[in-house]
């Protein structure tokens, strides 16, 4: 069965060009499925109009929602006229990330696409607070779309964790590879590469233990990672030349390799840890994301549960 058959596109309210919608249509043309163009809006000034009755406030909100709905319809007109099934939904909500995740849950959406803004000079992608909330808390995969065309022959680079002895990391590695291969086969037979980073010898160990041999330690760590990568690639029938085990910090290794390969997308897993307030993306993942210059797909483990709940009832 084809993946991503119920896509939610987060519309950027500040520009007419919508790269995330364009990417969703690109996927639709190759794998089918439905698209919902979704925009949460809020204007505090409308809440300050104490002279208005609740009915008048509701009417004002509804007027803004109608205006924005018509505006999105105009953005999507070309696709709609071409027969692409796009539903448009605008809601009034003062926390955009909550509105998006609630829509994902209530609508059963299996992929969220959102535009990632770029720093003009650095070309690096800049993530907003809403982006980070989605990457940390959205139960469905989140695809951050860079405002550039998909590179010709763009590859998919899957970042895997080869060091951990935790069983959930193995399951997540396999999920990342499996889903990326499935998607790649359906979208232009995209080439899939795997990357794992391993740490360099801590300098303080070499200083404190004179008999410690850094080269032996490095060889052992590298060997461990190579064996783990071999097992993973063999499970999915991936050629050795499509796998990369590199020495260094993940936040340097992964973006550098993505650039070297001219990757169109980096696929990354994040592990949810309940009880650790909003910090469960993990420093490593966040630093990797901060250095990327291409699209990003973030996937959670199967057992992940979002801390965001559906509202009991609509606000007045």
UniProtKB/Swiss-Prot annotation:
Cross-referenced InterPro entries: UspA
Pfam family, one: Usp
CDD domains given in the database record: USP-E_repeat1, USP-E_repeat2
Induction / repression: During growth inhibition caused by the exhaustion of any of a variety of nutrients (carbon, nitrogen, phosphate, sulfate, required amino acid) or by the presence of a variety of toxic agents. Positively regulated by guanosine 3',5'-bisphosphate (ppGpp) and by a RecA/FtsK-dependent regulatory pathway.
GO terms of biological process kind: bacterial-type flagellum-dependent cell motility; cellular response to hydrogen peroxide; cellular response to UV; response to stress; single-species biofilm formation
GO MF term set: small molecule binding
Chief location: cytoplasm
Gene Ontology, cellular component aspect: cytoplasm
Keyword Coiled coil listed: no
Keywords, in A-Z order: Cytoplasm
Subcellular location: Cytoplasm
Family designation: Belongs to the universal stress protein A family.
Function: Required for resistance to DNA-damaging agents.
Name assigned to this protein: Universal stress protein E
Source organism of the structure: Escherichia coli (strain K12)
Organism lineage string: Bacteria, Pseudomonadati, Pseudomonadota, Gammaproteobacteria, Enterobacterales
Gene this protein is translated from: uspE
């Amino acid at each position: 069965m084809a993946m991503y058959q119920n896509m939610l596109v987060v519309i950027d309210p500040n520009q007419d060009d919508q790269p995330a919608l364009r990417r969703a249509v690109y996927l639709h043309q190759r794998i089918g499925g439905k698209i919902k163009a979704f925009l949460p809006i809020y204007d505090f000034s409308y809440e300050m109009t104490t002279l208005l009755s609740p009915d008048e406030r509701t009417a004002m909100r509804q007027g803004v929602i109608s205006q924005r709905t018509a505006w999105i319809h105009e953005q999507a007109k070309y696709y709609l006229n071409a027969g692409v099934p796009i539903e448009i939904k605008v809601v009034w909500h003062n926390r955009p990330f909550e509105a998006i995740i609630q829509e994902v849950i209530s609508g059963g959406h299996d992929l969220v696409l959102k535009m990632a803004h770029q720093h003009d000079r650095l070309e690096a992608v800049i993530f907003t607070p809403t982006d980070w909330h989605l990457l940390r808390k959205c139960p469905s995969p989140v695809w951050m779309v860079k405002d550039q065309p998909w590179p010709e022959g763009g590859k998919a680079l899957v970042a895997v964790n080869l060091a951990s002895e935790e069983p959930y990391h193995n399951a997540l590695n396999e999920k990342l590879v499996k889903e990326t291969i499935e998607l790649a086969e359906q979208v232009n037979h995209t080439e899939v590469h795997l990357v794992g980073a391993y740490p360099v010898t801590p300098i303080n160990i070499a200083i404190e233990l004179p008999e410690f041999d850094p080269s032996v330690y490095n060889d052992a760590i590298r060997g461990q990672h190579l064996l783990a990568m071999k097992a993973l690639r063999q499970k999915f029938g991936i050629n050795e030349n499509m796998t990369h085990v590199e020495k260094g910090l993940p936040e340097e290794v992964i973006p550098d390799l993505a650039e070297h390969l001219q990757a169109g997308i980096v696929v990354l897993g994040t592990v949810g840890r309940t009880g650790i307030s909003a910090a469960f993306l993990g420093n490593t993942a966040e630093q990797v994301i901060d250095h990327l210059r291409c699209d990003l797909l973030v996937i959670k483990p199967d057992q992940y549960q979002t801390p965001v709940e559906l509202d009991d009832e609509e606000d007045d």
